[in-house]
Swiss-Prot record:
It holds the Pfam family Frataxin_Cyay. SMART domains: Frataxin_Cyay (SM01219). Involved in iron-sulfur (Fe-S) cluster assembly. May act as a regulator of Fe-S biogenesis. NCBIfam families: FeS_CyaY. It comes from Salmonella paratyphi B (strain ATCC BAA-1250 / SPB7). InterPro entries: CyaY (IPR047584), Frataxin/CyaY (IPR002908), Frataxin/CyaY_sf (IPR036524), Frataxin_CS (IPR020895). Keywords: Iron, Metal-binding. Belongs to the frataxin family. GO terms for biological process: iron-sulfur cluster assembly. GO terms for molecular function: ferric iron binding; ferrous iron binding. One of its GO terms (cellular component) is cytosol. This is Iron-sulfur cluster assembly protein CyaY.
Length: 106
C-alpha cells in the first residue's frame, strides 16, 4: 500500500465513524471532531477516544481509557497488531464503556 492509498482508506474509516454517529439514536451525547487528521470522540463524562493515522507505518492508532491499540490493514479489515481484534470491535467496546450504553458502529 502506498501513502495515498493509506490516506484514502483512513479517510473512509473516519467518514464511516462520522456517518454512524450522525445516525446513532442513543441517549448519550457523543461529539465527533476531526482536526489535522486526528478524530476525537468526546463523551458526556469528559472522557475521549482519539483515533489517528501513522503514515510512516500505514497504521491506524486508537487511544481509549482502556489503553492504546495499533491496527494494520489485513484484507479489508483493520486488525490490532497485538490482540488480533478488529478496529470496530475495540472501538465499540471502548465507546460502550465510555458512553455508559451500547454503541455500535456496524
Amino acid at each position: 500500500m502506498n501513502d495515498s492509498e493509506f490516506h484514502r482508506l483512513a479517510d473512509a474509516l473516519w467518514l464511516t465513524i462520522e456517518e454512524r454517529l450522525d445516525s446513532w439514536d442513543g441517549d448519550s451525547d457523543i461529539d465527533c471532531e476531526i482536526n489535522g487528521g486526528v478524530l476525537t470522540l468526546s463523551f458526556e463524562n469528559g472522557s475521549k477516544i482519539i483515533i489517528n493515522r501513522q503514515e510512516p507505518l500505514h497504521q491506524v492508532w486508537l487511544a481509549t481509557k482502556q489503553g492504546g491499540y495499533h491496527f494494520d490493514l489485513k484484507g479489508d479489515e483493520w486488525i490490532c497488531d497485538r490482540s488480533g481484534e478488529t478496529f470496530w470491535e475495540l472501538l465499540e467496546q471502548a465507546a460502550t464503556q465510555q458512553a455508559g450504553e451500547k454503541v455500535s458502529f456496524r
